[in-house]
């Protein structure tokens, strides 16, 4: 600045070092060490930087898998549930588009869209959330709603959910603030009665109240490295405004609530008469769920308002369970075949056995989650003896093995051993 003053006092004309304009052609000329820059060049530089930042953020959106691409990846791991996959893909894409495509304009603020998954046990709720997190390469954690209680009571505080998310990304706060949290068994924190209770419900309505701000967006104080809270401790501050919450639950009995509402709305001369056998598919009934049904089930209106996107999953039939056994990338049959291959043996599960496994899972009402248990039980003795057995080239499983009527058939490499076993 002293040099600028000297130049002015000496009557020397000054020029911008970038555009070459004189001090009389611009509003302001800023002096640096042996250089000058005018206000017009400063404004131009700001515009270039702003456009570059917007372009890089737009490029981030381009880097996101599009909804169709997300669904295609989900199809590789989860069988069926097309409608739920579409809803989830769009919701997750819009959520991360909201984060990555932030502009400098403040005229429209995009709200967060958390997701509620409703479906029977073993229909793929958790697997959908896990696969999405893997596709997007973001921190992911699963929380069990049944262990949560209000602060000050025995059980886990809701802040523990964020602590688990931090643990999943080595306590990188910036990464955690863009993660996904899946809260399982969310139906188990429903209010114990339709009307508010005069007694304190610390594991039901109380937990719903505690989750409200966390899901909407707040700054949660989390003890570093999983320590317990005490007054002299420094806390990690985690903003949950950009964390996507996906809540899932079986909501047993919700179909009856929906059916009773539908029957009430159809009273009168214009009511359509339906037989009791009609519309017995639980998945079809759940697809018609409304906020009123969830409130009657025990969720408070404020909590439902934090979950604007609702996806329902269908009950898996026998054909879908058979496909789950053989089609996904990590299908159970492929997993067990790999285990047997590591012992130098081939595993063949016949189509009739696949059908028997699916039927047994349906009888137990465990969905896809029960398939592994059935296969494990059928192959337990074989897997126990196989590492010590010699010359076993192949193990064949048929429907009788699944029903427990016989042992898996062993095929030996040598003809003599085969005759002995026969």
Curated annotation (Swiss-Prot):
CDD domains (alphabetical): RecA-like_ClpX
GO molecular function: ATP binding; ATP hydrolysis activity; ATP-dependent protein folding chaperone; protein dimerization activity; unfolded protein binding; zinc ion binding
Entry binding sites for ATP: 120-127
Keywords (A to Z) from UniProt: ATP-binding, Chaperone, Metal-binding, Nucleotide-binding, Zinc
Pfam families: AAA_2 (PF07724), ClpB_D2-small (PF10431), zf-C4_ClpX (PF06689)
Signal peptide: none
GO CC annotation, single: HslUV protease complex
Matches recorded under Gene3D superfamilies: 1.10.8.60, ClpX chaperone, C4-type zinc finger domain, P-loop containing nucleotide triphosphate hydrolases
Residues annotated to bind Zn(2+): 16, 19, 38, 41
SUPFAM superfamilies on file: Glucocorticoid receptor-like (DNA-binding domain), P-loop containing nucleoside triphosphate hydrolases
Nucleotide-binding as UniProt keyword: yes
Residues annotated as domain ClpX-type ZB: 4-57
GO biological process: cell division; proteolysis involved in protein catabolic process
Assembly, per entry: Component of the ClpX-ClpP complex. Forms a hexameric ring that, in the presence of ATP, binds to fourteen ClpP subunits assembled into a disk-like structure with a central cavity, resembling the structure of eukaryotic proteasomes.
Protein family (similarity comment): Belongs to the ClpX chaperone family.
Primary role: ATP-dependent specificity component of the Clp protease. It directs the protease to specific substrates. Can perform chaperone functions in the absence of ClpP.
Full protein name: ATP-dependent Clp protease ATP-binding subunit ClpX 1
Taxonomic source organism: Methylococcus capsulatus (strain ATCC 33009 / NCIMB 11132 / Bath)
């Amino acid at each position: 600045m002293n040099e600028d003053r000297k130049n002015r006092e000496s009557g020397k004309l000054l020029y911008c070092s970038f555009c070459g304009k004189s001090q009389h052609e611009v509003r302001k000329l800023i002096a640096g060490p042996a250089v000058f820059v005018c206000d017009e060049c400063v404004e131009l530089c700001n515009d270039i930087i702003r456009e570059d930042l917007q372009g890089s953020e737009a490029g981030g959106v381009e880097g996101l898998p599009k909804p169709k691409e997300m669904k295609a990846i989900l199809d590789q791991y989860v069988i069926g549930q097309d409608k739920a996959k579409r809803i989830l893909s769009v919701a997750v894409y819009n959520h991360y588009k909201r984060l990555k495509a932030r502009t400098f304009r403040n005229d429209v603020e995009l709200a967060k869209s958390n997701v509620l998954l409703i479906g029977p046990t073993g229909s793929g709720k958790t697997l959908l959330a896990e696969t999405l997190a893997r596709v997007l390469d973001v921190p992911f954690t699963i929380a069990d709603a049944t262990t949560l209680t209000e602060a000050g009571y025995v059980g886990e505080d809701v802040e523990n959910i964020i602590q688990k998310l931090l643990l999943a990304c080595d306590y990188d706060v910036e990464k955690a603030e863009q993660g996904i949290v899946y809260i399982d068994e969310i139906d188990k924190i429903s209010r114990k009665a339709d009307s508010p209770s005069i007694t304190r419900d610390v594991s039901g309505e109380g937990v719903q109240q505690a989750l409200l701000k966390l899901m909407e967006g707040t700054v949660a104080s989390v003890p570093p490295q999983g320590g317990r809270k005490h007054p002299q401790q420094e806390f990690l501050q985690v903003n949950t405004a950009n964390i996507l919450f996906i809540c899932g639950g079986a909501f047993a009995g919700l179909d009856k609530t929906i059916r009773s509402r539908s029957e009430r709305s159809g009273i009168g001369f214009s009511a359509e008469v339906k037989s009791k056998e009609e519309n017995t598919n639980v998945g079809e009934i759940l697809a018609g769920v409304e906020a009123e049904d969830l409130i009657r089930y025990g969720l408070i209106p404020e909590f439902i308002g934090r979950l604007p996107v609702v996806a329902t999953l269908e009950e898996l039939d026998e054909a879908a369970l058979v496909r789950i056994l053989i089609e996904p990338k990590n299908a159970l049959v492929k997993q067990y075949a790999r285990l047997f291959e590591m012992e130098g043996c081939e595993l063949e599960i016949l189509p009739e056995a696949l059908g028997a496994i699916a039927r047994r899972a349906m009888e137990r009402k465990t969905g896809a989650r029960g398939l592994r248990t059935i296969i494990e039980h059928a192959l337990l003795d074989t897997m126990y003896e196989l590492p010590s057995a010699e010359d076993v080239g192949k193990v064949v499983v048929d429907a009788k093995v699944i029903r427990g009527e016989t042992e898996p058939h062993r095929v030996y490499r040598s003809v003599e051993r085969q005759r002995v076993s026969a």
